[in-house]
Amino acid sequence: MSELILKCEGVGKRYRDGGLDVLVLHGLDLEIRAGESTGIIGSSGSGKSTLLHILGGLDMPSEGRVLLMGEDLRTLNQRRLGDLRNRHLGFVYQFHHLLPEFSALENVMMPLLIGKKSREEAAEAAMAMLEKVGLKHRSTHRAGELSGGERQRAAIARALVTQPKCLLADEPTGNLDRANARNVLDMMLELKTELGTGLVVVTHDDELAGRFERVMVMKDGSLHPKQGANA
């Protein structure tokens, strides 16, 4: 069995909205392993993105716990949490969040520079990752000079350049047309296999979700395997 990266145990999340106590997630159990792909689908407002934020340590559960590489995220100080997250997790969102004043290469270098790599090391690793996503020839172009699909490829390269254990993606193809969405997903799945990275993707697109090894449905704050899905 492949390495266990993330584990949710009885995870729940509540928010206060005025005088109301709103239950968003309850009783969630989930394991994410290296090299496995998981799609999470559900209606808008069902809690998909909230779960992804909790998996990534960007938010904490109201009950239960999340283990990242065996460490309970609730027990960590902010410095240790940030270090663990930066070392083991990559994030991709619907909007690419590339810095417009920098080239594709410089954007992909950024996580490595933040991690104290030298510019030479960062540039070499970033260029290698841009080559993997088919953007080596566009490395000197700024975000505004790239197409929508190219910008999302650059964002994925940036998320993977630190070689994280798991990539968490929130609607990564949501701003793309159908052809580009398929191409980007193909690339993510290929890199998942090549790098042995766990992949968790939140999407509203049932067709794209069907490409993953496991599909989970978020409904009424609970997570269930999709009937008839692979897994």
Swiss-Prot record:
GO terms for biological process: lipoprotein localization to outer membrane; protein localization to outer membrane. Residues 6-231 form the ABC transporter domain. Its main location: membrane. It is a peripheral membrane protein. ATP binds at residues 42-49. PROSITE patterns: ABC_TRANSPORTER_1, ABC_TRANSPORTER_2, LOLD. Gene3D superfamilies: P-loop containing nucleotide triphosphate hydrolases. Pfam families: ABC_tran. It is found in: Cell inner membrane. InterPro entries: AAA+_ATPase, ABC_transporter-like_ATP-bd, ABC_transporter-like_CS, ABC_transpr_LolD-like, LolD_lipo_ATP-bd, MacB-like_ATP-bd, P-loop_NTPase. Its EC number is 7.6.2.-. CDD domains: ABC_MJ0796_LolCDE_FtsE. It comes from the Bacteria. GO terms for molecular function: ATP binding; ATP hydrolysis activity; transmembrane transporter activity. GO terms for cellular component: plasma membrane. Keywords: ATP-binding, Cell inner membrane, Cell membrane, Membrane, Nucleotide-binding, Translocase, Transport. Part of the ABC transporter complex LolCDE involved in the translocation of mature outer membrane-directed lipoproteins, from the inner membrane to the periplasmic chaperone, LolA. Responsible for the formation of the LolA-lipoprotein complex in an ATP-dependent manner. The complex is composed of two ATP-binding proteins (LolD) and two transmembrane proteins (LolC and LolE). Belongs to the ABC transporter superfamily. Lipoprotein translocase (TC 3.A.1.125) family. This is Lipoprotein-releasing system ATP-binding protein LolD. It comes from Neisseria meningitidis serogroup A / serotype 4A (strain DSM 15465 / Z2491). The lineage of its organism: Bacteria, Pseudomonadati, Pseudomonadota, Betaproteobacteria, Neisseriales.
